[in-house]
């Protein structure tokens, strides 16, 4: 699929409502999310899964080819793509680009033949391997402009991950009380918030960790059966997705309790994965079983008043979440993409 920037700009003028999602529960004038363009990593049949975006507008992510091989990529702000990013130790065809900062330093992970995940930093074509010391698996998920980074690690090979953040070289880990695995997906430049998700049995819930180290959970829109918080910016605008009644919606979250929904037109699966300080969002939608990347922008000012009752945080136990419904949607792997 080629870039649709010109087409979408025209359609936005002719048919505003299909391409602009107004923040739920608020007046239309208060703010909206507007699609800018769509994109796919070059090649036939590739699933394109954007993950994070920097202030330049560079997007890091991964693509999955028709044989199921996953490789990382960077889509630069001019619309060009990097060569496939493949960690030299990846011997099973699984390398992911997960985070990118304004210096274009990339954080990601890869798998090896014993099924374990390991991580890397990539800058200027050079790989630097990284594993949390004395652990079996490490999953890097973001890097900020100071070089601080987040992710998760499995200390003993059990497959149960603990979230962590490394700030100024000091690593701090945590788990949501009572949870299985906990993942830390991004930290902003002010180190005010870390966002992510955790597993409660087979159910996914969002959470955030504030500057004082306090965990706030569960972060679930009412009716959600699976919530993931993927990215945030220095304004503490958070993006992610949630599933409800067989549809996966893009999620815009303003702490502590405001949720707003965005659905790509005509798709039953939308994921918002990264957002920069200019309000540019990267994410994906699924059409005919194929995942496509898109860029969108926040228009106007996101509302800050409390939500209507139908969108308050879900404090009741969630229903059973659908497990990996398709490679296009979940990437057929955990941690979520």
Residue ranges of model-derived segments:
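Residue-level hotspots at or immediately adjacent to binding/recognition sites across diverse folds
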Residues: 21-337
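Bacterial N-terminal signal peptides
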Residues: 9-18
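Bacterial N-terminal signal peptides that target proteins for export
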Residues: 1-10
């Amino acid at each position: 699929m080629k870039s649709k920037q010109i087409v979408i700009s025209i359609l936005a003028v002719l048919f505003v409502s299909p391409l602009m999602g107004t923040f739920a529960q608020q007046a239309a004038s208060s703010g909206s999310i507007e699609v800018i363009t769509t994109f796919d990593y070059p090649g036939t049949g590739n699933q394109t899964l954007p993950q994070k975006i920097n202030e330049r507008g560079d997007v890091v992510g991964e693509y999955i080819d028709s044989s199921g091989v996953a490789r990382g990529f960077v889509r630069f702000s001019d619309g060009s793509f990097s060569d496939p990013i493949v960690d030299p130790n990846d011997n099973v065809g699984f390398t992911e680009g997960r985070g990118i900062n304004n210096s274009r330093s990339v954080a990601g992970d890869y798998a090896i033949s014993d099924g374990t995940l390991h991580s890397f930093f990539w800058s200027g074509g050079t790989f630097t391997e990284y594993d949390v010391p004395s652990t079996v698996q490490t999953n890097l998920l973001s890097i900020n402009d100071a070089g601080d980074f987040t992710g998760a690690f499995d200390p003993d090979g059990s497959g149960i991950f603990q979230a962590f953040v490394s700030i100024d070289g000091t690593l701090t880990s945590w788990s949501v009380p009572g949870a299985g695995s906990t993942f830390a997906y991004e930290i902003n430049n002010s180190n005010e918030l870390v966002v992510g998700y955790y597993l409660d049995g087979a159910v996914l819930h969002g959470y955030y960790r504030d500057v004082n180290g306090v965990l706030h959970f569960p972060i679930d829109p009412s009716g959600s059966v699976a919530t993931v918080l993927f990215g945030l910016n220095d304004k503490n605008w958070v993006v992610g997705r949630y599933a409800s009644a067989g549809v996966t919606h893009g999620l815009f979250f303003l702490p502590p309790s405001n949720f707003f929904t965005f659905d790509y037109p005509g798709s039953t699966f939308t994921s918002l994965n990264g957002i920069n300080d200019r309000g540019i969002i990267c994410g994906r939608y699924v059409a005919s079983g194929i995942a496509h990347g898109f860029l969108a922008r926040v228009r106007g000012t996101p509302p800050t008043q409390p939500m209507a009752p139908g969108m308050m945080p879900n404090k009741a136990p969630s229903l059973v979440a659908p497990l990996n419904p398709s490679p296009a949607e979940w990437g057929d792997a955990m941690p979520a993409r």
